[in-house]
Amino acid sequence: MQLFHLCLIIFCSCPTVQASKLCLGWLWGMDIDPYKEFGASVELLSFLPSDFFPSVRDLLDTASALYRDALESPEHCTPNHTALRQAILCWGELMTLASWVGNNLEDPAARDLVVNYVNTNMGLKIRQLLWFHISCLTFGRDTVLEYLVSFGVWIRTPPAYRPPNAPILSTLPETTVVRQRGRAPRRRTPSPRRRRSQSPRRRRSQSPASQC
């Protein structure tokens, strides 16, 4: 397995220092968090279950459809664009390496181990990275961070004391902000009905004819 990581470092031609540090962190267990500079953390992302993240193919299609021009531009756009470029390049190199290893390994069991490791471990890391940066570009970084906190609070709350449905990122500002939960709309108390005057009615003066 260490040989596999070493091959990853050699073949992962990431263009920036941050991506290179990410690869080195996987090899030597360095405490490098790729989300730290964006206000998040690996631990915060870990609250989301693995099946929450779309497939790499779907995420790449989304990135291409929404941000292809910015990703291919030679100019610097945002740190999220840069990190997204790095993740896409690393995944491409990783697939090239996995194909090379698969084609050159004669042992089917060893080949399956490599493929499963890439898809299960490395694939999940890439899916998390792609989802995070695409979401930051789509919804805004503050909204994504607030969503991660809201989901973390929701998932750690016992089922009996939390809403049945998890927060949804696209509707976060309207419905899933933690501080807005539990507030019922204030009803206007009806004003008391105006009581009638208790003063006795004035008697109508009787005509002399009625007194006869």
Curated annotation (Swiss-Prot):
Extract the ranges annotated as region (HBEAG). 25-27
Chain residues in the propeptide: 184-212
- Report what the Swiss-Prot or TrEMBL entry states about this protein's PTMs: Phosphorylated.
Cite the residue spans of the region called 3 X 8 AA repeats of S-P-R-R-R-R-S-Q.
Answer: 184-206
Q: Which SUPFAM superfamilies match?
A: Hepatitis B viral capsid (hbcag)
Q: Which domain of life is it from?
A: Viruses
Q: Where are the annotated segments for Disordered?
A: 165-212
Positions annotated as sequence repeat = 184-190, 191-198, 199-206
Q: What is this protein called?
A: External core antigen
Q: Which organism is it from?
A: Hepatitis B virus genotype H subtype adw4 (isolate Nicaragua/2928Nic/1997)
Instruction: Name the gene that codes for it.
Output: C
